[in-house]
């Protein structure tokens, strides 16, 4: 039951700005439903762009019964770039030691057995590496090969992909 509730919750959140049931309360004010996973057999993955809740590739996490654990930020030293010629649009997170940090990420937890099929879907220049979070924890997460940021727009100042998308959308 817990796994099914978690999948339903993640799917509901991935649909965007929906209300909670028949109320006018936004879904985001409700805490996420967590699946009961064995921490010894699960992997925490930080996502930063098209895999965030409500974004086009979030379904790849939901299909693997991943559970949203929290939204947090990276440690200092990271920069975020809007990569050119990606579909759907994607950011690239790069550690260069100079970034102010504080890039928004979501931490998802998935069973070890689902991790390989998830990683196999990630196209270059993106990949999975170890990220340091603002509180000092380390998790696996999306990183970008440094050559891909040549000519890419540095969007670090926005603090995250969602904020950049919101600012770049015409009103």
Pin down the residues of each PLM region.
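Basic, polyanion-binding surface patches
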Residues: 72-100, 108-110
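Mid-chain, well-packed structural core segment of small domains
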Residues: 93-135
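C-terminal edge-of-domain segments
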Residues: 132-171
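Short Gly/aromatic-enriched secondary-structure transition segments
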Residues: 57-74
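Anionic-ligand-binding alpha/beta catalytic cores of soluble enzymes and soluble regulatory domains
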Residues: 42-55
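Structural helix-boundary/capping segments
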Residues: 1-38
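Domain-scale detector for complete catalytic domains at protein termini or as standalone homologs
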Residues: 38-40, 48, 97-99
